[in-house]
């Protein structure tokens, strides 16, 4: 069984599965049965942490498509898994309801129905919309926790000031921000804040949208429909070429540890922080199992220090973050790096 970690009160496997790609974001999706089987196999090898969102599926299918798949795959083992999902809140729908709480609850009820459950373990605000008070969302999440409808809540793509204010209203279980060897911005403030305040940190795109696996090359053709990689600046040909030194570092350590590049990139962040639980995404069962296997790749302190020093000596070219951000102020933090 895989080692466990804590996201505040939630006990999860050290690595989770990002389920988005089964419905959204990385081009053509597998057959439904394949996706369901892949999630069940991940559970069988010890993964209990599955990440989805109400919006996944909206481009090719419909919002909720991914939650339905996760529900079909895992409702038979519901009590043994930790399900994380996310909501977006628009100002007009908040205005149409009597309160932020009512608006949040109506999203939650719809997600629970699709997931085939009567509670969600970890409910994230997917993006902060500056026209909707996040303080009121935080208070609403507290009420939902009190009612037993969610076990914990979180924020995604959040900066440290917003996080601290939200945490003061209702303690946050986990932050889900972009974090990988190519996107280390959260090391400055957000992750240290989370470590200090017993908040879990769940990196999304931990393999840098596949780049760190070494399998994406300048010849890789991204798909026409619903493939986020077409818009990820780090995956422009010039950046793929310029970031090769990072792949060389990974390749050295992969050889040393008899592991894959993707596994080393995950083992690195697990070693670095005790509260980090990455959710790599893949629509391919073998790769899902490979990524979960990174929990067994243990770096010694010395190996980690060498890896860290080698990474710090590399310049990262291009970034990904801003394409993931809708709110103005936090979005500008990423844009400055262009
Ligand atoms: N909170 C947010 O705003 C947010 C944003 C984005 C994502 N997420 C969540 O985070 C999860 C992970 O993020 P992500 O999918 O964007 O990025 P990721 O995990 O860094 O990368 C996914 C890409 O890498 C490839 N890949 C994965 N493992 C591989 C391996 N071992 N070898 C070779 N290629 C591999 C996948 O291809 P194949 O599918 O072909 O294997 C896919 O193209 C998502 O599933 C989603 O749940 C959250």
What are these regions (language model features)?
Residues 186-225, 260:
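Aromatic-lined glycan-binding groove of carbohydrate-active enzymes
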Residues 2, 225-256, 271, 275, ...:
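Terminal-tail/helix-coil boundary detector
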């Amino acid at each position: 069984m895989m080692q466990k970690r804590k996201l505040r009160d939630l006990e999860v496997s050290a690595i989770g599965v990002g389920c988005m790609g089964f419905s959204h974001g990385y081009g053509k999706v597998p057959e439904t049965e394949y996706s369901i089987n892949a999630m069940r196999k991940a559970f069988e090898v010890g993964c209990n942490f599955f990440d989805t969102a109400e919006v996944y599926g909206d481009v090719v299918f419909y919002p909720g498509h991914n939650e339905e798949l996760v529900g079909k795959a895992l409702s038979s083992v519901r009590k043994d898994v930790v399900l994380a999902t996310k909501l977006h809140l628009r100002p007009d729908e908040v205005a149409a309801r009597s309160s932020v709480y009512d608006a949040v609850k109506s999203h939650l009820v719809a997600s629970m129905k699709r997931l085939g459950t009567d509670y969600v373990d970890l409910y994230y605000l997917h993006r902060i919309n500056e026209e909707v008070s996040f303080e009121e969302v935080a208070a609403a999440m507290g009420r939902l926790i009190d009612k037993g409808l969610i076990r914990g809540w979180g924020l995604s793509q959040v900066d440290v000031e917003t996080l601290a204010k939200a945490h003061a209203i209702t303690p946050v279980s986990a932050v889900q921000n972009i974090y990988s060897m190519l996107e280390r911005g959260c090391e400055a403030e957000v992750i240290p804040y989370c470590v200090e305040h017993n908040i879990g940190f769940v990196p999304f795109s931990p393999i840098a949208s596949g780049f760190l696996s070494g399998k994406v090359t300048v010849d890789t053709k991204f798909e026409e429909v619903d493939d986020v990689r077409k818009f990820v600046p780090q995956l422009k040909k010039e950046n793929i070429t310029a970031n090769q030194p990072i792949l060389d570092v990974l390749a050295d350590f992969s050889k040393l540890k008899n592991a894959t590049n993707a596994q080393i990139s995950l083992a690195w962040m697990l070693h670095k922080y005790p509260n980090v639980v990455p959710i790599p995404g893949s629509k391919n069962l073998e790769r899902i199992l490979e990524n979960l296997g990174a929990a067994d790749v243990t770096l010694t302190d010395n190996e980690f220090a060498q890896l860290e020093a080698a990474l710090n000596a590399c310049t990262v070219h291009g970034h990904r973050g801003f394409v993931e951000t809708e709110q103005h102020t936090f979005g500008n933090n990423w844009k400055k790096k262009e």
